[in-house]
Amino acid sequence: MKFIPHTDEERRQMLKHLAVENTDQLFKDIPSELRLNRDLAVEGGLSEMELQSHMNSLAGLNTGVDQTICFLGAGAYDHYIPSAVKHILSRSEFYTAYTPYQPEISQGVLQSIFEYQSMICLLTGMDAANASMYDGASALAEAALMACAVTRRDKVLVASTLHPEYREVVKTYLHGPGIEISEIAYQEGLSQLADIDQKLDKKTAAVLVQYPNFFGCIEDLGKIAEQAHAKGALLVVCVDPIALGILKSPGQCGADIVVGEGQSLGIPLSYGGPYLGFMACKDKYLRKMPGRIVGQTVDVEGRRGYVLTLQAREQHIRRDKATSNICSNQALCALAATVYLSLVGRQGFKQVAELCLQKTAYAKELLAALPGYQLPWQTPVFKEFVLKTKEAPEVINRELLKENILGGLDLGGYYPELAGHMLFCVTEKRSRREIELLAARLGAIS
């Protein structure tokens, strides 16, 4: 395939400058047996109509929530998205992945980010929020690094009730700086407070917990905050934002940094994203927080305006000392969350959370009454719960899929001690009929 912008003469001049005879010499470090010494096996171009048909046929191979009844969660959730969210997102003024390079000119974009930050602060009970992160997992890892920078310590405690894939991302981020990670054991679906006490020491920068946790269980943040602060460590909380419609905010419970995955706030399910990481913290840690921050100010004539503030923390000012490496930002996803929260309002948001709680309780009651199924713990939960099964989860999910039902997550792949256990999710979208259908199908399988 030819690289169109360069002429033959330009390529000749570049090769001469590099003192090589041909482009193959530029790849001499790659063994010849690993090189593709032929043209790519790509067919000719397609017309727009043909391409659209081809893409539709590929998309048709997917099995998504539009074709099934979804009881699968574990970090990505099937919540209702008001149609106005997509409409507003599609406006040309907003539809880009990039922050303007002369940001103060784009006051509308900056104001939307400022409103997003304000809403995240209201939800989390924190003083300040950034303009968004890549996703919940990277936001948590960045928060761990931030806590180490704030405390100048090099150890973090990570709850084993945190999302297993989030924990893997945290391990990856902390491996390079050589930060020690110690996992907190769990019992009855909750982090063991005694284990936290035992592992906390003067080297500990932070305790990382999830609220509600991976099993849907609601951790006692107040007690964990007391334990962490007694040793000079910070409490970092990864939250489900929908749960904050009815649960106490992490800020009220003593959290220092709050992060989470914002996909539930108006962003559709998509394998590979893009999703939305959010981060908020107390005022005193603001300068250590990664990512862009939009502030409100007044111009020389006293008119309200919005600016990117504290930019010295960012990579376009001090790349080697920047607090993060965020380039293409998640501002469009942050806008989706802003529009969603604005549309549903305070009461609507609370109602979404209450519906999740009520429908989860109904599903728990029905499924636990079935022969061959039981609840391993009696811990209070939100939106998700663990169910012990007699049949193998793999068999159950295969049978459910025949009925166009996406079943729960097989926990045995993440927690060997929970082989034969499934994690079910029930959002506000699930109807009484769908929950009863799930119970009927599970009853038939057992």
Curated annotation (Swiss-Prot):
Catalytic activity from the UniProt record: N(6)-[(R)-lipoyl]-L-lysyl-[glycine-cleavage complex H protein] + glycine + H(+) = N(6)-[(R)-S(8)-aminomethyldihydrolipoyl]-L-lysyl-[glycine-cleavage complex H protein] + CO2
InterPro entries: GcvPA, GDC-P_N, GDC_P, PyrdxlP-dep_Trfase, PyrdxlP-dep_Trfase_major, PyrdxlP-dep_Trfase_small
UniProt KW Transmembrane keyword: no
Pfam family, one: GDC-P
Keyword set includes Ribosomal protein: no
Alphabetized UniProt keyword annotations: Oxidoreductase
Biological process terms in GO annotation: glycine decarboxylation via glycine cleavage system; nucleoside metabolic process
Name of the top EC class for this enzyme: oxidoreductase
GO molecular-function terms, A-Z: glycine dehydrogenase (decarboxylating) activity
Domain of life per record: Bacteria
EC number: 1.4.4.2
Record family assignment: Belongs to the GcvP family. N-terminal subunit subfamily.
Task performed by this protein: The glycine cleavage system catalyzes the degradation of glycine. The P protein binds the alpha-amino group of glycine through its pyridoxal phosphate cofactor; CO(2) is released and the remaining methylamine moiety is then transferred to the lipoamide cofactor of the H protein.
Subunit-structure text: The glycine cleavage system is composed of four proteins: P, T, L and H. In this organism, the P 'protein' is a heterodimer of two subunits.
Name by which UniProt lists this protein: Probable glycine dehydrogenase (decarboxylating) subunit 1
Species of provenance: Desulforamulus reducens (strain ATCC BAA-1160 / DSM 100696 / MI-1)
Gene: gcvPA
